């Protein structure tokens, strides 16, 4: 792969992702052996010249959406998180014990109304979106070959019974402390991806959601090789997060940037927005990183489905034309910002 990339005059310096096994996250008996394997992989990447490794510490659910093709007025579609649909999935499909305690009376009432009219096909589509399509190609826990993805998903959730935020934090500290010597030896920067969306889901602890969480893991293992993947899209989906302010605060500990934006609705729903719009304020974010951490790897993240992308079978969020449009937008932003800073 390295030779193939370099044959086009490019340099392979970032890997996204080197997945962290669930047993490392929940602290299973095989944790130490799995961490040793991880250290070997890190060393091999470092020897190959890869100096930036993105990963996440999200239990079970890497990222959550309820719709993969929510329509825009211009005919394109993008990813969407409908909170009531997610409540319905949790309470009526997953049937998670105690789920109702996590939601408001209004959300539960709306989910109950949805239960009266939803069709079997709509239920299957919701399962396919939340469990299979968004999870299967990310970490391999679930695939389209699973005959009963809901039961498999319940088994994965059960692994975290009794695991709260403090326990997951300590497991993250344990993991990072173990791999930092390898990072130091081979000059590899580890950068954790924020939880997507940055809120608690399905009773699982989520520990990279906001300013306080970021400060915690950076201070817990205070090593320059322990850093952040600054995903503007994930962070902007949390109304608690001022994305440019976080960029200013954590620019020096950011090793990788994802350029994506969202619009958050008053009811808590969010939709992936145009790269030049939404609450992430990507123009200002690019300006901050170009000024405070020049040379940090940045990439356009996700894109709308448009202009025939619909029939190509692309993974959710990774359409060709939509991503090329986002890339062109961000390329223009970077050119203007660099001229501005060099003036």
Language model features: what each stretch is:
Residues 10-25:
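A short glycine/small-residue-enriched secondary-structure motif
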Residues 1-9:
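Aromatic-lined substrate-binding rim segments of carbohydrate-active enzymes
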Residues 18, 58, 196, 302:
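Residue-level "edge-of-site" marker
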Residues 6, 23-27, 32-53, 61-66, ...:
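Histidine-acidic metal/acid-base catalytic patches
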Residues 67-167:
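Extended, charge-rich helix/loop segments that form flexible
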